[in-house]
């Protein structure tokens, strides 16, 4: 009888405690500090800066040129946050078609690493706010130190004479000849189309400089200037075999810092991830690399038995990705974001910077709404399945849903949301 009473009391106690425990662990303690978040497009960073200073914008989700916020007077009325995580790269079209494509030759693509002056990009174009890159791993990436020996083994330095030598040798092997200073193949002058982002001053300058380098080697360069919308049509939306483009100046952002990055190598180098020329459209020519696919899939699904094996896989994938040179990384950048002085609670996350999903959740304003300026509002596929392929729409999308887990803004460890 005593035992029955004991168990009855225990069960009743659990029934009393359980609801309060469930309520405590299932619901957030409080909501956000604002009731509404507005996103407004501002293409011009200088205009956006003044709007933030005047209080018409609370935050601007795009970098502001360092020379605009150098002095104490320049920073009156605003807060400035610095963040790493963004980068620049050059996408190369390696397709094979009826028209001769010089970039279908792997060794020729690899030579482009000597044609780009990475130090010039960092020191001059972005004013020292960045570092040179040769792979998708920047110096602040969690895995950078474990693969630094692999990266340094390439010994890349700006050497246009060496690039010219390699490119010339490969073109001659392919049957091309130089006539009056320009390369020809089968009696036709070789023309390359460089799609250059005109809406980004840095990428525009990179494209202009590299175009001159290619012209010095003997290529006829057609410069096609355009913005994000045009890039999605011409570069990412066309059949690479049609050769509407050969080179493209890319820019990358980050949604956060990952302590164990399982996606980066697949995203930047591997065909299976659908982010390489052709994008796995069955009606297009597609870049293929079974070796890279095999390695990056193992990293993606954690198919390794130790940290040492994981590092080995990362080294192999990095070496192959850089050697193939379909996507050539140029520089990482330190972005400077501006916020109005009256806004508190900004989260400057590692990798993502101020545009992290945690900023709108935590930001405090004297008003019920938070007004955020963005560089672009791309009207693409707002679809969580194979959509949101640009950083601008992702900055909005990541505030519209709660994933099961997300990387901690300061440690990179996965935390439950």
Please annotate each region the language model reported.
Residues 7-9, 14-56, 106, 110, ...:
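The feature preferentially marks the first beta-strand/turn patch immediately downstream
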Residues 29-40, 188-194, 212-231, 295-298:
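A local structural motif
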Residues 37-39, 96-102, 108-111, 148-156, ...:
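Second-shell loop/turn segments in exported
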Residues 38-96, 119, 124, 250-255, ...:
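Extracellular/periplasmic solute-recognition and catalytic clefts
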Residues 46-57, 107, 208-217, 230-245:
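Short helices/loops that flank or line small-molecule/ion binding pockets
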Residues 78, 82-86, 232-298, 385-390, ...:
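Acidic-aromatic pocket-rim loops
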Residues 104-212, 216, 288, 316, ...:
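Append "and occasionally in soluble cytosolic enzymes with long acidic Gly/Pro-rich linkers
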Residues 110, 122-127, 222-232, 261-340:
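Extracytoplasmic/peripheral linker and loop segments enriched in polar/acidic and small residues
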């Amino acid at each position: 009888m005593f035992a029955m009473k004991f168990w009855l009391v225990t069960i009743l106690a659990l029934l009393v405690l359980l609801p309060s425990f469930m309520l405590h662990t299932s619901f957030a303690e409080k909501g956000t500090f604002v009731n509404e978040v507005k996103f407004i497009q501002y293409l011009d960073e200088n205009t956006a800066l003044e709007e933030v200073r005047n209080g018409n914008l609370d935050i601007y989700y795009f970098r502001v040129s360092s020379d605009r916020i150098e002095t104490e007077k320049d920073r009156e009325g605003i807060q400035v946050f610095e963040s790493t995580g963004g980068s620049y790269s050059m996408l190369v079209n390696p397709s094979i078609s009826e028209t001769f494509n010089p970039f279908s030759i792997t060794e020729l693509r690899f030579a482009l690493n000597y044609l780009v002056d990475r130090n010039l990009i960092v020191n001059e174009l972005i004013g020292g706010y960045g570092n040179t890159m040769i792979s998708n791993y920047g110096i602040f990436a969690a895995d950078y130190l474990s693969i630094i020996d692999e990266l340094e083994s390439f010994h890349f330095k700006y050497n246009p004479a060496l690039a010219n030598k390699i490119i010339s040798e490969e073109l001659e092997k392919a049957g091309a000849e130089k006539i009056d200073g320009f390369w020809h193949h089968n009696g036709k002058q070789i023309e390359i189309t460089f799609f250059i982002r005109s809406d980004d001053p840095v990428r525009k300058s990179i494209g202009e400089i590299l175009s001159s380098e290619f012209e010095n080697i003997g290529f006829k360069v057609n410069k096609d200037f355009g913005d994000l919308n045009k890039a999605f049509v011409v570069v990412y939306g066309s059949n690479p075999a049609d050769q509407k483009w050969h080179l493209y100046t890319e820019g990358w952002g980050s949604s956060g810092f990952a302590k164990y990055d399982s996606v980066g190598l697949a995203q930047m180098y591997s065909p299976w991830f659908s982010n390489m020329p052709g994008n796995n459209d069955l009606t297009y020519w597609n870049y293929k690399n079974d070796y890279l696919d095999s390695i990056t899939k193992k990293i993606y699904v954690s198919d390794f038995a130790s940290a040492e094996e994981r590092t080995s896989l990362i080294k192999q994938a990095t070496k192959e990705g850089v050697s193939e040179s379909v996507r050539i990384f140029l520089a990482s950048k330190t972005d400077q974001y501006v916020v109005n002085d009256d806004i508190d609670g900004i989260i400057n996350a590692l990798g993502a910077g101020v545009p992290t999903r945690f900023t709108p959740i935590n930001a405090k304003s004297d008003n019920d709404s938070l007004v955020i300026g963005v560089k672009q509002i791309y009207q693409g596929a707002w679809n969580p399945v194979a959509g949101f392929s640009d950083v601008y729409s992702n900055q909005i999308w990541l505030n519209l849903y709660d994933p099961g887990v997300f990387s901690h803004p300061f440690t990179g460890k996965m935390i439950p949301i």
